[in-house]
Regions:
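Residue-level preference for long, well-ordered alpha-helices that form the structural scaffold
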Residues: 8, 184-187
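Conserved amphipathic alpha-helical segments that form helical-bundle/coiled-coil interaction surfaces
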Residues: 99-176, 194-200, 209-221
Length: 233
């Protein structure tokens, strides 16, 4: 048999495999509740964000049911459920960490080089996010446009493609399933304030301030996605 390349496996998939094995071997049975997230992360020796990515993947496989305010329960799996779409998917927290690295620099570049028309386009995208938020909608498309406008204003087409790829992952199945566990209206006001600070820094051509504002926004996004999933009552 010819030698085949060894593919690195994402941590959340390794965690998911271990939990899946515990379920298939009968350690946890359908209807049973898993230990609280904090305890389970400690037992596995992993971070809670990585564990959460694994739990979301297993929920999409119908092996688990994450009930906000109640707990994480083993379910009777649906064998017909397709999981191929998860094979190459990045975990939501991987995407957030990558966004911090890339979009912080995009914001700094935008502050240095954005034209008046580009600043107006960023403001218009920010307004669209606000309008969608007022209707209690998760303004995902408007949010994507806001961040793409910033990347475009930086004038680096390679970075624009990277941000586009990150947002393709941002809108993928793992991320979208995670968002169902969150209460978007409670996050909207903070998100909009953070966006406003980014816009202001870019408009005054403050590269350092724009980078700092974007880093703060992405850091707070990580915090919200880590904190607001309450399943341990």
């Amino acid at each position: 048999m010819p030698i085949q390349a060894v593919e690195p496996r994402r941590l959340y998939r390794q965690i998911a495999d271990q939990i899946r094995t515990l379920i298939t071997e009968g350690e946890y049975t359908p209807g049973e509740r898993l230990p609280p997230e904090r305890d389970l992360a400690k037992q596995l020796g992993v971070s809670r964000p990585s564990l959460r990515e694994a739990l979301i993947a297993l929920e999409m496989e119908t092996l688990l049911d994450v009930r906000v305010g109640s707990g994480i329960y083993v379910t009777q799996p649906d064998e017909s459920r397709r999981t191929a779409e998860l094979a190459g998917a990045s975990g939501p927290f991987e995407v957030i960490r990558a966004r911090r690295l890339i979009e912080g620099e995009c914001a700094a570049l935008a502050a240095k080089s954005a034209t008046g028309a580009q600043v107006r386009a960023i403001r218009e995208a920010h307004t669209a996010v606000l309008e969608e938020s007022k209707r209690d909608h998760n303004p995902l498309d408007a949010d994507r446009l806001f961040h793409m406008r910033i990347a475009e204003a930086g004038g680096n087409s390679a970075l624009v493609l990277v941000v586009q790829t990150l947002w393709d992952q941002r809108m993928g199945p793992l991320y979208r399933t995670l968002e169902l566990k969150l209460e978007y209206p409670l996050m909207a006001a903070d998100t909009n304030r953070e966006h406003k600070a980014i816009v202001a820094a870019i408009a005054r051509h403050d590269a350092r301030g724009a980078r700092r504002a974007m880093h703060h926004h992405v850091d707070m996004t990580m915090k919200r996605y880590s904190k607001d999933w309450k399943v341990e009552q």
